[in-house]
């Protein structure tokens, strides 16, 4: 391949969600409110689980880690996105862009794998209740969280290094509100075929394997629930798993739409709307999904409020 002489970009300009000035301030207020709700909801859930001894179980250990990932996930993206509404040009340095992409990928992959760990936890709890505390020991729980974090960090690091070893000389204007792969690849003057193949392969393998764990776990769970003689037991099992199923459907559904589609149909404006959903909306929704239908969380919150009063 012939060498292309070009000046390497040292910074990028994030276009943001809209160019319409009249929309920027209302959107700033809206997304700031959502972000504050996300921070309060997720950190509040973590503190509640830590404060109430009745919630010191494997299920809530995983839930507190999911809340932590959601908090970090949103915090990597939203503050910079809010800057898009306040500044004429939202500039991000080359290194900061790489850091944002790496952190974003770390927490996105972590969330995907944590949802699979939580599905396995629910499988053991419902299908083998007598062995639950024997199987889900503190050591096993830590491993089911540590492995996703470690794997996610290594994958994100390799992925980010591949992206930022490319030459960026066509333009430095990123048609997005954060540093993401597809908008960045459109700016490079390097051959991106290997990189695009890597994105598709990694996303496909990770999503399919984690979804397979979730699917198989829930096949056994549903089978076990249908065999229960107690209507109350069935209702409790369904309510416990229903929250997780809803969170899984929303998260994986959005990511499949985003990453497992042909590049020819990869419209960046459509991707921006999907990205808002899974980087801003989902981290806000998860505390609500897992709390509103959970009697134990609501009881723990009531106890804290009563004790303070």
Curated annotation (Swiss-Prot):
Where are the disulfide bridges?
97-189
Outline which residue ranges sit on the Extracellular face.
Answer: 1-25, 76-99, 161-197, 259-271
Domain of life, source organism: Eukaryota
Q: What Pfam families would the database entry show?
A: 7tm_4
Instruction: Give the way it sits in the membrane.
Output: Multi-pass membrane protein
Q: Which GO terms describe its cellular component?
A: plasma membrane
Keywords assigned by UniProt?
Cell membrane, Disulfide bond, G-protein coupled receptor, Glycoprotein, Membrane, Olfaction, Receptor, Sensory transduction, Transducer, Transmembrane, Transmembrane helix
Kindly list the residue ranges recorded as spanning the membrane: 26-46, 55-75, 100-120, 140-160, 198-217, 238-258, 272-292
| Gene3D superfamilies according to UniProt | Rhodopsin 7-helix transmembrane proteins
Its annotated compartments are: Cell membrane
What the entry lists under InterPro entries is as follows: GPCR_Rhodpsn, GPCR_Rhodpsn_7TM, Olfact_rcpt
Residues annotated as glycosylated are: 5
Q: Which residues lie on this side of the membrane: Cytoplasmic?
A: 47-54, 121-139, 218-237, 293-309
Q: Which SUPFAM superfamilies does this entry report, sorted A to Z? A: Family A G protein-coupled receptor-like
Q: Name one GO molecular function term.
A: G protein-coupled receptor activity
Q: Give the family from UniProt.
A: Belongs to the G-protein coupled receptor 1 family.
PANTHER family per the UniProt record, alphabetical: OLFACTORY RECEPTOR
Q: What does this protein do?
A: Odorant receptor.
Q: What is this protein called?
A: Olfactory receptor 8U1
């Amino acid at each position: 391949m012939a060498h292309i002489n070009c000046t390497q970009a040292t910074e990028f300009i994030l276009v943001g969600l809209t160019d319409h000035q009249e929309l920027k301030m209302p959107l700033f207020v809206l997304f700031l409110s959502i972000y504050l709700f996300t921070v309060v909801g997720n950190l509040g859930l973590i503190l509640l689980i830590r404060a109430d001894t009745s919630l010191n179980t494997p299920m809530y250990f995983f839930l507190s880690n999911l809340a932590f990932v959601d908090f970090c996930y949103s915090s990597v993206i939203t503050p910079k996105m809010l800057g898009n509404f306040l500044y004429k040009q939202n500039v991000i340095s080359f290194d900061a862009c790489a850091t944002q992409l790496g952190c974003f990928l770390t927490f996105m992959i972590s969330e995907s794998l944590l949802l699979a760990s939580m599905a396995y936890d629910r499988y053991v709890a419902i299908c083998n209740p007598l062995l639950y505390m024997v199987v889900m020991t503190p050591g096993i729980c830590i491993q089911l969280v540590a492995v996703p974090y470690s794997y996610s960090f290594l994958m994100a690091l390799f992925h980010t290094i591949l992206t930022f070893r490319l030459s960026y000389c066509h333009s430095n204007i990123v048609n997005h509100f954060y540093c993401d792969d597809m908008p960045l690849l459109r700016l490079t003057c390097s051959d991106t075929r290997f990189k695009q193949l890597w994105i598709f392969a990694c996303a496909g393998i990770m999503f399919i394997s984690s979804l397979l764990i979730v699917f198989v776990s829930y096949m056994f769970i549903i089978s076990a629930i249908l065999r229960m003689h107690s209507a109350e037991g069935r209702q409790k099992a369904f309510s416990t798993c229903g929250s997780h199923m809803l969170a899984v459907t929303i998260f994986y559904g959005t990511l499949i739409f985003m990453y497992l589609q042909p590049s020819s149909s990869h419209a960046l404006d459509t991707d921006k709307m999907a990205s808002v959903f899974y980087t801003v909306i989902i981290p806000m929704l998860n505390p609500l999904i897992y709390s509103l239908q959970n009697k134990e969380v609501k009881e723990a919150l009531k106890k804290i409020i009563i004790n303070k009063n």
